Amino acid sequence: MKKSLLALTLLALPALAVSTAASAAEGVSYNYVEGGYTATNLDDAPDSDGWGLNGSVAIAPNFHVFGSYNQQDFKDINYGYDQWRLGLGYNHEISQKVDLVTRVAYEKFKGDDFTVGGVRFPGDDLDGYSAEVGVRAGLTPFVEGYAMAGYEDGKDFDGDFYGRLGAQVKFNPNWGITGDVKFADNDTQWFVGPRFTW
């Protein structure tokens, strides 16, 4: 139920931004929804993959809310997990085509329940937060890119710094294909899929 509600919310984001215009660098929009393939490569555990949804809505000239949800399953074992985050971002135009972006978010990780020797155990249920800063730019009329540095922490896991790189190739003003990679201490996370921008 929670998965369906979050997925529907992300898909409904375009309706929430009816009259809000963001003050953003040329070629950059904070009103979008995207979905696609996601994967995680871990140093000390099996890799996982699945699907994900991401979205953002400008709520004021320099502020946007954003969210993401992904569901992945580990390869070769019967175990999966859900991750989601919801946050607030601030964007400040530092040149005609470049924005400085800062974002903070609440994060949630929920692992599947599992059974060992006929005994059922609850999956991990972890809460945390993240903060990141970076730049986002319209590199050409058809290509947008970003680079971010961040930190995430939670009460049940150790904090970690990470880097994030991403780009979008635009087919027209509304549609494009986007890719994102996040590098952390123990894992690398990937996302690729179509984006609808308004």
Indicate where each model-derived feature is located.
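Transmembrane beta-strands of outer-membrane beta-barrel pores
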Residues: 37-43, 61, 69-75, 82, ...
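Outer-membrane beta-barrel "beta-signal"
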Residues: 86, 163-169, 174, 187-198
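Cleavable N-terminal export/targeting peptides
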Residues: 1-29
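Residues that define the transmembrane beta-barrel architecture of outer-membrane proteins
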Residues: 29-31, 47-51, 80-84, 108, ...
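Outer-membrane beta-barrel proteins
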Residues: 20-23, 41, 52, 59-61, ...
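Membrane-embedded beta-strand positions of outer-membrane beta-barrel proteins
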Residues: 33-35, 55, 65-67, 88, ...
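Short glycine/proline- and aromatic-enriched beta-strand/turn motifs that initiate or cap beta-hairpins
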Residues: 20-75
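Repeated loop/turn-to-beta-strand initiation elements of outer-membrane beta-barrel proteins
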Residues: 31-33, 61-67, 95-100, 111, ...
